[in-house]
Amino acid sequence: HNGRAITPTRLTPDAVPFSMYFNLDKPLIGFWLLLVCPWIAPRFSWRVSLRATAMGLALAAIAALGGAMLLGMVAWAPKWPHQGTLWLLNNLLLVTLVEEALFRGYIQGGLSRKLKLLPYGQTVALVVASVLFGLAHAPAGWQWMLLAGLAGIGYGLAYRFGGLSAAIATHFGLNVLHLVFFTYPMLTP
């Protein structure tokens, strides 16, 4: 079993209890991909990556957080939980880096390389990676699957125009916005 880092806690009175584990098995996949497939992390200037991050984060936030509010999944709830620093480290290193290495770097990047001669190959690669990312969130319910797929489009655009670091920053940025400004993880049904 993975170690529990945060015991079930309500971050706001209207939220479902949140708990967090240090899932150390999943990161092995991401780190392995970074070592074995260096092509998943194309190089972009920091300015280009920063612009791609801003664009991707704006789109992902409007689609995913706006969609979550429309679906009644979250509400405005600004806060800084006392577990915030631990959450930040876990989310950056063991969640977003790993998920983006797999979904954007390996899947979207790999498909982009294979489909580069097709007129819409880059778009197909982005959509396929986003759909698969959404499906990976299916255990949380159709709403989170839909919202993750929409967020995945923002992450995919950041990857396409700014590389893996932009996709990681976009994903991490959206997760931080969710934690700090909205009900986390979701409203109690």
Question: Where are the language model's segments positioned?
Answer:
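Transmembrane helix-loop-helix hairpins at the membrane interface
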Residues: 58-189
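Juxtamembrane helix-loop-helix connectors linking adjacent transmembrane helices
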Residues: 2-95, 113
